[in-house]
Swiss-Prot record:
Family annotation (Pfam families): GATase
Catalytic reaction equation(s): 5-[(5-phospho-1-deoxy-D-ribulos-1-ylimino)methylamino]-1-(5-phospho-beta-D-ribosyl)imidazole-4-carboxamide + L-glutamine = D-erythro-1-(imidazol-4-yl)glycerol 3-phosphate + 5-amino-1-(5-phospho-beta-D-ribosyl)imidazole-4-carboxamide + L-glutamate + H(+); L-glutamine + H2O = L-glutamate + NH4(+)
Source organism of this protein record: Corynebacterium jeikeium (strain K411)
Domain Glutamine amidotransferase type-1, first and last residues per copy: 11-242
First-listed, main subcellular location of the protein, grouped into a coarse class: cytoplasm
Name of this protein: Imidazole glycerol phosphate synthase subunit HisH
Gene Ontology MF: a single term: imidazoleglycerol-phosphate synthase activity
Function: IGPS catalyzes the conversion of PRFAR and glutamine to IGP, AICAR and glutamate. The HisH subunit catalyzes the hydrolysis of glutamine to glutamate and ammonia as part of the synthesis of IGP and AICAR. The resulting ammonia molecule is channeled to the active site of HisF.
Length: 242
């Protein structure tokens, strides 16, 4: 094998759509072994070995910003071709069916009324406010790594062992900053495809989806770029798949 090819660093496009601390994520993925380009250029996004989708703030605002740069189409095109995508924080939440937020004071939804925003629908589920006395859920927390046993119980093929958390101790903690999450996973039972591998965490009275592995599509509710050595290892695991 040509040594220049074998030593090539994977090229990651970090989608710049106005949401998220892109520089922090860029530096972390570079430390994980990839070359990172912050971009919204469609050709660059499609050409890259991997696409990183960050996101912070309100679900509705992130979806609006994503649509403004046709980011939803770019993500969909990559997934249709089996090309790797990693979503972080709200970048994970927008992959679900919808998000619900509650208006405060006056606004389109009215005081205290629920406002629904359609997501990308890659996974079934609704992003809702966590049930906890202290919000946001800010700080370090452990993750309950899934093993595919729920799929086996439904007569479906068990998911393969986690690649995302390979080499990471169960006691490791990751850094979360959020008030909303997906608290129910509606597992598909058609038996035709291997189900995603779902990982969970808890805060207050809520148990929520902390991360998902679904073929080329990975996502985390926590911030691996802010999660020390454990987060760096997770990013290295993703880069190794590119």
């Amino acid at each position: 094998m040509n040594s220049s090819l074998s030593s090539r660093r994977p090229h990651v496009a970090l989608l710049d759509y106005g949401s998220g601390n892109v520089r922090s994520a860029q530096r972390a993925v570079e430390r994980a072994g990839a070359e990172v380009e912050v971009t919204r250029d469609p050709e660059t996004v499609q050409r890259a070995d991997g696409l990183l989708v960050p996101g912070v703030g309100a679900y509705s605002a992130c979806m609006k910003q994503l649509h403004s740069v046709y980011g939803d189409r770019l993500i969909g095109q990559r997934l249709a071709g089996g090309r790797p995508v990693l979503g972080i924080c709200v970048g994970m939440q927008i992959l679900f069916d919808r998000g619900v937020e509650f208006a405060e004071g006056t606004g389109e939804a009215g005081a205290g009324e629920a406002a629904f925003t359609e997501g990308m629908g890659e996974w079934p589920g609704t992003v809702e406010k966590l049930d906890a006395d202290v919000l946001p859920h800010m700080g370090w927390n452990t993750v309950e790594v899934g093993d595919g046993s729920s799929a086996s119980a439904l007569g479906k093929p068990a998911a393969e062992p986690t690649k995302m958390f390979a080499g990471i101790e169960e006691t490791e903690r990751f850094y979360f900053v959020h008030s909303y999450g997906v608290q129910e996973w509606e597992l598909l039972t058609d038996g035709r495809t291997e189900p995603p591998l779902v990982h969970w965490a808890s805060h207050g009275r809520s148990r929520f989806v902390a991360a998902v592995e679904n073929g080329p599509l990975w996502a985390t509710q926590f911030h691996p770029e802010k999660s020390g050595d454990a987060g760096l290892k997770l990013l290295q695991n993703w880069v190794d798949t590119l």
